[in-house]
């Protein structure tokens, strides 16, 4: 019983840390260029899809070419239902592994006969725990993967992988930024008339 209580406490800590995780892996941390004062280029990316390296490369090149642009990056969160499913699976996985290790039959609690897969799991605890762990992680990762690589400049969308279906090349991104910067300079130079 103590082991089950310990597993529940550990699972709630995992859920809280997963819910607050940001791009850097540290709760509340965002990757950003701290000292620039110009326009804000914001990346919202799917970290679990492996886009963090792409973001870091783009950030390096853009910060060299446009030193005045502030760059921020954060994880693009999936829809709340998928986040809740992933959190539930994270807790359920730990409870199920705990029950397998302890050898308690949860089906007896409900007055049901244990299925053959549960009996197999009791006979092969290591394999059963590994299978539960890896299958649950696979489903959790699928729920948390968005495939997003969204870019905004001063809160105006300039690229969306969700809409276009592919990442921008470095040349495309530089061309988009050049056009946006020229447009902003042009708009700032137009005299404003008072009525």
From Swiss-Prot:
Q: Which GO terms describe its molecular function?
A: thioredoxin-disulfide reductase (NADPH) activity
Note the topology in the membrane.
Single-pass membrane protein
Keyword match Cell division? no
Q: Where in the cell is it found?
A: Endoplasmic reticulum membrane
Please tell me where this protein is predominantly located. endoplasmic reticulum
Membrane-spanning segments:
85-103
Record-linked InterPro entries: Selenoprotein_Rdx-typ (IPR011893), Selenoprotein_T (IPR019389), Thioredoxin-like_sf (IPR036249)
Question: What does the UniProt keyword field contain?
Answer: Endoplasmic reticulum, Membrane, NADP, Oxidoreductase, Redox-active center, Selenocysteine, Signal, Transmembrane, Transmembrane helix
What modifications follow translation? Answer: May contain a selenide-sulfide bond between Cys-46 and Sec-49. This bond is speculated to serve as redox-active pair.
Tell me the leader sequence span: 1-19
Name of the featured protein = Thioredoxin reductase-like selenoprotein T
């Amino acid at each position: 019983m103590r082991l089950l209580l310990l597993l529940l406490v550990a699972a709630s800590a995992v859920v809280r840390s997963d819910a607050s995780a940001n791009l850097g892996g540290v709760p509340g941390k965002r990757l950003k260029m701290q000292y620039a004062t110009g326009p804000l280029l914001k990346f919202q990316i799917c970290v679990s899809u492996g886009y963090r390296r792409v973001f870091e490369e783009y950030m390096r090149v853009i910060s060299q070419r446009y030193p005045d642009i502030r760059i921020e990056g954060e994880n693009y969160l999936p829809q709340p239902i998928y986040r809740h499913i992933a959190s539930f699976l994270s807790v359920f996985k730990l409870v199920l592994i705990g029950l397998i290790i302890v050898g308690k039959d949860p089906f007896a609690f409900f007055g049901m006969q244990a299925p053959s897969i549960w009996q197999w799991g009791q006979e092969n605890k290591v394999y059963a725990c590994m299978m539960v762990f890896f299958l649950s992680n696979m489903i959790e990762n699928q729920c948390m993967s968005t495939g997003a690589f969204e870019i905004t400049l001063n809160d105006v969308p300039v690229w969306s992988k969700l809409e276009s279906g592919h990442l921008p090349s470095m040349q495309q991104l530089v061309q988009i930024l050049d056009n946006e910067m020229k447009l902003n300079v042009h708009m700032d130079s137009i005299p404003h008339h008072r009525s």
